[in-house]
């Protein structure tokens, strides 16, 4: 490695002597004023200094980033990251790709063992558990049993990977949620590694195959979500290429008032940042209010960066970070190293250091103005103060669908359905809460809101309140430590008394694994076509995500989740209406059972012990007896089973070789879509309908509908996933009138069929395909199958008004061209309907962000000519596109290197 600026120094702690690259030396040498750089940019700069090789990372790269300005312009940053994290929904297809790459390199005469993570990778199995059983003491055991039954093939693949791949660890099922395991155990904040006989210290940094990887930003660790294909490239030693971002400085001051929680704060921050516009930017928090937030509070805010649209929500390392490392049982010598290193290198936050920093844009929030809130019913940025939820929900019932309402007429509002059970009967109506889920790493990582929920449950039970019988209740924490401290505090029995029994350690309801509603409830919802609600402590509430029967979804703190389980309806004003009545008929209001901050702090003091973390994480990679009993396949190549409906060798590397890039001519439009189309819309993760192309494929393979599992669990099989692309029941193809769901029109014939069937007919004719969309295309999860499925359907380009960051780069990574309308232009202004035939010209000599010419020929022979920006943002992305994708580029380079050394 080079050291052009002579910044390599040493520091000594009790645990030894470490080499480190001193950022502050650049300032002393007059290269750049590093002290005015945002802390997040400094972490990136350190990576460049440490990895300068004159080829992938050059002296010029370092100088350009060191001289970052609030309006940074075009600075290409080749980031070398310290590690990669994966979850199993996105991790399984990544492992499938690595296995397929081993096959491909062997077929070309190369060594399969060259395909190995160079960068350490940890995969946490958390996305597969579903809430089949709930509300009973045996729910956890039943759900885990079902999880293993459904996912045996996938888990065998992951065990093969654990054995066959170097630098690859797996956290088995039933252990925790990836981001919570990451902040409580995996991240060290400061890493060490050997180079040239010296032990180097350097900041932890990572990418993850899940958009909420940003949670670790709460500990001052650089990290964000990427698609599986990009994560694989990083694992294989490729730099992660990005443009230096604008950094929004978000000042926090004051203190949270009594009654407000970290959840209320994050929903407020999300609303503010979505309004401000932070897509593609870093957000860095500073100011006196930061010191008033615990690390779990910060991690809650960082977790929801995808919801506010930022690449990161960054809190620099400070005294509170060190406290958290101690609280979670990290070794004292690590804490000492983190403190010594971050102070030596200029990465430790102090009020004096903050004052010098220059940001691109500024926002501020007085924490004392935060009030109890929910977000919904369809988007995480749509915050509603608790006191206005009733009014807001009732208004949404009749609001038009295009204004994110439910479009009910006045006479539909009165619908009620009587449900009769053996020992009771009750009415369901619009606004009945049918799911109340304490779920998601966003909140279950935060002891204050979890113990708060337990205290609220205790007071409710003591007042004689109970959950409503139509509410499906669940508790799914992100780590075993949560149940340990809930049990130690004596609060678990009160949560269980209200039906909040442990259902699993995993994502569950937050990602749509809410399991089926009880049959009588589902039937009543269908019969009355009711707009029923879910209240969850998650981070996403997009339509159609949580449960196919539930149209209104609200994000809330765990305490409010319990409150809505007691109320059983959204049309309640907690400030004026009682939750229920005690045995003497006395009304009980929410304020009567809401725990005080002092009660919560006292519960934390009594129960949160570093030994809990040490105990649970000492065996984090072991798994239960089921995991240990799985017969792990061996060998450097994976043995594909042609009969498997979970794992198949994908066709991505069949035509490996440099391709000639040509103009796209004679393209037809498969779908015209509106704004905020999510990756959930493009590639759903939840249930597979029987009559869908994916369902019919599985039936043809002898799979019974009750064994379909979910789309997310079948991401290792491209045959299922390409059939599931654009198959969300809530997607709206604007080329079709009055039809919702995954349908398209075959042109010029004009007949309507499933998207997959129409795409295959076009493919048979050799017709390239195009998708046209509005703003924020691809928002939501970092789901690489949204790009892989797009590619496999034969879609060559996506033309949108704007793209969410991860999905745009995933499209490039699959060799699909993202095209952006020029500012002020869109489908409507240009009069495009989707019935035209398209030529996309000027692709032979592509360069970053080139303007390409598009000709749209209408049915009457007239033409619309316009230009669009080819969103290949860096020279490297142009190469990826030319080679057919990022993994193809990596393989081609490996084969070239192997030839050169022969």
From Swiss-Prot:
Pathway: Carbohydrate metabolism; tricarboxylic acid cycle; isocitrate from oxaloacetate: step 2/2; Organic acid metabolism; propanoate degradation. It catalyses: citrate = D-threo-isocitrate; (2S,3R)-3-hydroxybutane-1,2,3-tricarboxylate = 2-methyl-cis-aconitate + H2O. Its cofactor is [4Fe-4S] cluster. SUPFAM superfamilies: Aconitase iron-sulfur domain, LeuD/IlvD-like. Transmembrane segments: none annotated. Binds 1 [4Fe-4S] cluster per subunit. It comes from the Bacteria. Its EC number is 4.2.1.3, 4.2.1.99. The keyword Iron applies. Involved in the catabolism of short chain fatty acids (SCFA) via the tricarboxylic acid (TCA)(acetyl degradation route) and probably the 2-methylcitrate cycle I (propionate degradation route). Catalyzes the reversible isomerization of citrate to isocitrate via cis-aconitate. Also able to catalyze the hydration of cis-homoaconitate to yield (R)-homocitrate, but with a lower efficiency. Could catalyze the hydration of 2-methyl-cis-aconitate to yield (2R,3S)-2-methylisocitrate. The apo form of AcnA functions as a RNA-binding regulatory protein. This is Aconitate hydratase A. It comes from Thermus thermophilus (strain ATCC 27634 / DSM 579 / HB8). The lineage of its organism: Bacteria, Thermotogati, Deinococcota, Deinococci, Thermales.
